[in-house]
Regions:
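Sec-dependent N-terminal signal peptides
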Residues: 5-15
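Beta1/beta-strand and adjacent pyrophosphate-binding region of the FAD-binding site
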Residues: 23-33
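Conserved beta-strand-loop-beta-strand element in the redox core of flavoprotein oxidoreductases
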Residues: 140-158
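Flavin (FAD/FMN)-binding glycine-rich loop and adjacent Rossmann-like elements that form
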Residues: 20, 152-163, 167-469, 599, ...
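Conserved N-terminal/central alpha/beta ligand/cofactor-binding core
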Residues: 42, 48-49, 54-138, 142, ...
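N-terminal Rossmann-fold NAD(P) dinucleotide-binding loop
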Residues: 36
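Terminal recognition/anchoring or ligand-binding modules at protein termini
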Residues: 497-619
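Bacterial Sec-dependent signal peptides at the C-terminal "C-region" and cleavage site
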Residues: 14-24
């Protein structure tokens, strides 16, 4: 009897220890969101053993699981893994033009197609494991990293990891790890932004339970059961209607509204802000039960809108697509969250740094680019008076600094998706799919470099991360002068983040741009300032307004001597001219900015030679 008791105790202990030990990995990504899948893929590609935990059945987050399958921005900047994803869409649908089915975007697709693409991309990485239907519960810091508890189909599992990446939709992991964060509108006196509010409050952007509808044919009647408490007046001004009496709103006709998110294969993404299915609620700090109750209301709003389209507008042939989501209600797995917690990071990116990037130094640390405007959805908020102090204006395209990924006080943790360290205002443009995908890719690089070289996250330098990004199709600066496969693209990117020559940002309606101005001559005054920032004791000698080809040669030779770099002679420079793909060598003509960047990058390698810290200051 005594032996049986001892045996039972031993077996119980062994079982308990087995349950506690769980899978071990180098990088653990929590959330298979747009940023999470990119982080996991990139980390694995760099040789780090990586696991992604995803609560639902699909990877891709807002691009797939939330049904926002119309890409916002970055059409001319298909960076990194986002670019790979877009290329896969092109391969599936036949051409880039085949993706331009609606007017809200040039890239629209069926969410299920996007989910299959991401699943296939992840499956190709031998160092990556994806575990679906796994919900995060808690995280505990250990001496060597993190211990994470998650629920997998009703069973608790424990994961151990060196580095943790929070790629959840609402920053739940960051909170569990003790990261300080902000929620909602900021006082302009605190954020330093003229566009911000006049006080701090927890008002966030509206969320949306998007719908993917399908045209079932002219004879079909897909009308759903009338939702409880249905009120058609809520939707009168969603499109032109005799019932719309609002003198301020100028709604489009229904056909225009439907073509907004038209997808391939006679499907429609319904994500309509103008008295459509945007819904205001702030569930960020709620428990699971509270969140479920609020999201049920958001679903109800969308279904009421669907019933309005079917019953009031005569579109009975449109119904929820039965070949998209494997959910009981045919709605997406998750809503489209436009705003989440925003961590207090080692840097805080605000709109001033977008409007006037060269007044600051953070642009030198760029790891993602975007061209979408500052777009806040607040139409569904019930008390519009509280929002009157917010103002929004045009912005150029921009890059996002690396420091937004790193919490100020917690180590061995990277935060991605929409919970990065940006202001409330800036979240309106960094929240979009291409940007968060790039942020995730950078997070994966940062994590992998740290674990593979046994370093702390903050010991990984900005330039190391940027170098890997460039090697993997990424952008550091939002220049659109050259496509990323052009042989001079990387040189312009490297010279750009060094600040030797500066780009010009423009805001043209919603098509925000930044140009390196590659064909323009090099201004002596601008160049002198750019060199002084990096080589403060070097004295540049040049005459006239613009630098000539011969003066460029002389400058490179002089800087080579100053920096004690051997092998930089006028003869070498002339020989390299053709080898580097440059043409029309004439010593007395003005050198173009592209030519100068290519030569300077090749001979003096400032990107490699001059490191910058997380704030963009030379070290």
């Amino acid at each position: 009897m005594k032996n049986r008791i001892i045996l039972s105790v031993v077996l119980a202990a062994l079982f308990f220890c087995s349950a506690c030990s769980g899978p071990k990995t180098e990088v653990l990504v929590i959330g298979g969101s747009a940023s999470g899948v990119a982080a996991g893929i990139q980390s694995a590609r760099l040789g780090a053993k990586t696991i992604i935990l995803e609560e639902h059945l699909w990877l891709g987050g807002m691009l797939t699981s939330a049904g926002v399958s119309a890409v916002d921005g970055n059409y001319r900047m298909p960076a990194g893994i986002f670019g790979e994803f877009r290329d896969s869409l092109v391969a599936h649908y036949g051409s880039l033009g085949a993706l331009a089915t609606g007017w809200v975007s040039n890239v629209l697709f069926e969410p299920s197609v996007g989910a299959r693409i991401y699943k296939n991309m992840a499956a190709r990485e031998p160092n990556l494991t994806v575990q679906y239907e796994t919900k995060f519960i808690s995280a505990e810091k250990t001496a060597t990293g993190w211990k994470v508890v998650a629920d997998h189909n009703g069973k608790q599992e424990v994961f151990e990891a060196d580095i943790l990446i929070d790629a959840t939709e609402l920053g739940d992991v960051a909170k569990a790890c003790g990261v300080k964060y902000d929620i909602g509108i900021e006082d302009r006196n605190i954020s330093g932004e003229a566009w911000a509010g006049d006080k701090n409050c927890d008002i966030i952007q509206d969320l949306t339970y998007a719908m993917i509808l399908k045209d079932y044919g002219p004879e079909a009647d897909m009308t759903i059961e009338r939702p409880e408490n249905y009120d058609p007046s809520l939707f009168y001004c969603s499109c032109k209607s005799q019932n719309c009496t609002d003198s301020v709103l100028k709604p489009w006709d229904f056909d225009m509204v439907m073509r907004y998110g038209k997808l391939p294969n006679n499907k429609y993404m319904i994500n309509w802000p103008m008295q459509g299915n945007d819904y205001y609620t702030n569930i960020i700090e709620m428990d699971e039960k509270g969140r479920e109750a609020e999201l049920k209301k958001a679903k109800h709003r969308s279904l009421c809108y669907l019933y309005y389209m079917q019953h009031e507008l005569g579109s009975k042939n449109l119904g929820l697509a039965d070949d998209e989501y494997p959910t009981e209600d045919l709605l997406p797995f998750i809503p489209y969250h436009r705003e989440s917690r925003r961590i207090q990071g080692v840097v805080r990116f605000n709109v001033n740094q977008i409007l006037r990037p060269y007044d600051y130094t953070l642009y030198r640390t760029g790891i993602a680019v975007g061209d979408y405007p500052v777009d806040h959805h607040h139409q569904a908020y019930p008390n519009q008076e509280e929002l009157k102090s917010l103002t929004f204006g045009p912005v150029p395209s921009y890059n996002v600094p690396m420091g937004v990924l790193l919490p100020k006080e917690v180590t061995d943790l990277i935060v991605a998706e929409k919970s990065v360290s940006v202001s409330n205002i800036v979240n309106g443009c960094t929240r979009l799919q291409p940007v968060v995908t790039q942020l995730g890719q950078a997070a994966g690089i940062l994590a992998a470099l740290a674990v593979k070289e046994n370093r702390e996250l903050r010991e990984v330098t900005v330039r190391e991360v940027q170098k890997v990004l460039l090697e993997n199709g990424g952008y550091l600066m939002p220049y659109i002068d050259l496509p990323k496969d052009h042989p001079h693209f990387k040189a312009l990117q490297r010279i750009g983040v060094c600040g030797i020559l500066k780009g010009e940002g423009r805001s043209i309606n919603w098509a925000n741009e930044t140009w390196f101005r590659k064909d323009e001559p090099v201004g002596v005054s601008e160049l002198s300032q750019g060199l002084a920032d990096l080589y403060p004791t070097f004295k540049m000698e040049a005459s006239g307004e613009y630098l000539s080809v011969e003066e460029t040669e002389n400058l490179l030779v002089a800087l080579g001597v100053f920096l004690e770099k051997e092998g930089i002679t006028a003869e070498h420079i002339r020989k390299a001219w053709g080898d580097l793909g440059l043409r029309d060598y004439k010593p007395n003509r003005p050198v173009s900015r592209e030519e100068f960047a290519v030569l300077f990058d090749h001979f003096l390698t400032p990107f490699d030679m001059i490191r910058v810290d997380i704030n963009g200051m030379p070290v």
